Amino acid sequence: MRASTACLVALLAPFYISALPVEYFYGDEQQPIEEGAENSAVFEQDRELIGLFNPSKEIGQVSGLAVNKNGHIVAFHRSGRVWDEKSFNDHETFNKDLGVINNKTIAIISREKKVIDEFGAGLFYMPHGLTIDNNGDYWVTDVGSHQVHKIDAKTQKIVMSLGEKMVPGEDQAHFCKPTDVAVAKNGHIFVADGYCNSRILKFDAKGNLMAQINAATEENQPSEFVVPHSLSLIEDMNIVCVADRENQRVQCFSAGLSEGDRTLPTGIPITSATDIGRVFAIREREHYLIGVTGNSEDVEAQMFSIDMQTGKTETFAKGVRNTHALAIAADGVMFVSQLEPSRILEIRLL
């Protein structure tokens, strides 16, 4: 068993998800983080060690996180920009007076917390999602410009954009505050669109629309997405999972990537986890789907793990609030960004 697998296996307890419809249950209760503990350099809960991953150089609010092929942490951040009531008008158009962010917005950070490279100045308006494809190139979403961009990792230049700059819309050529992007090895692009349209769109490698994924119909569950905030693509299982934030659930669908006579078309419901809190980010590693949630009326902020092969689930890191982005390193260490206070947490399982 590889180290990263062993690290994640330690989470699992006998709880299950199954084919639709299904209810989600959470496992052993843990004490919330004590008042003031969140400001400590390191604090320990029952099953995890949580420390502050403070980069050597100050960066802004981190809206997107990823781990590159070298094992470095990549942070997509907003520099000094803050998303508030002045950022957009009633038609979802970004406030042109704010202009582009002139500072660098992408930081590459070593595991020793040293900022080893920065770029992205003069490109983005309100950074949001980040992923790294199989070739090591970066994909980001900018809710300010209503676009998705591919950035060449070597040149650090935008080489492809989807959506019309600064123009929100709901047709095939426009997005409205897209939140996240996932890219398959064959070049197919999945976009969570997002805060306004609440839909999932699939494009080919050239940016041509292939399919739209709609929310699965489940008993006693909403029939539409409400802020699909994060995506996770599990290619060898032909699954794409959606963090349906305001519906407090994760829904997983066929990704339409397999070939042959038994290929499932894109968007067939596969499984789901419901009533788990407002899910801000999901990421997969070795068939474990890891997620972070925010506070809701019935469920406190926490993280969860789902074994996508067996359906076993568990929760952990209860009380870690205001999270937004998640990345998982090869050794199973998890990195979680918080917007308030603005920082990155490093979470190791005991």
Curated annotation (Swiss-Prot):
Disulfide bonds: 176-196, 241-252
Enzyme Commission number(s) of this protein: 4.3.2.5
CDD domains: NHL_PAL_like
Reaction(s) this enzyme catalyzes, per UniProt: a [peptide]-C-terminal (2S)-2-hydroxyglycine = a [peptide]-C-terminal amide + glyoxylate
Keywords in alphabetical order: Disulfide bond, Glycoprotein, Lyase, Metal-binding, Repeat, Secreted, Signal, Zinc
The family this protein is said to belong to: Belongs to the peptidyl-alpha-hydroxyglycine alpha-amidating lyase family.
Protein name per Swiss-Prot or TrEMBL: Probable peptidyl-alpha-hydroxyglycine alpha-amidating lyase pgal-1
The organism of origin for this protein: Caenorhabditis elegans
Biological classification of the source: Eukaryota, Metazoa, Ecdysozoa, Nematoda, Chromadorea
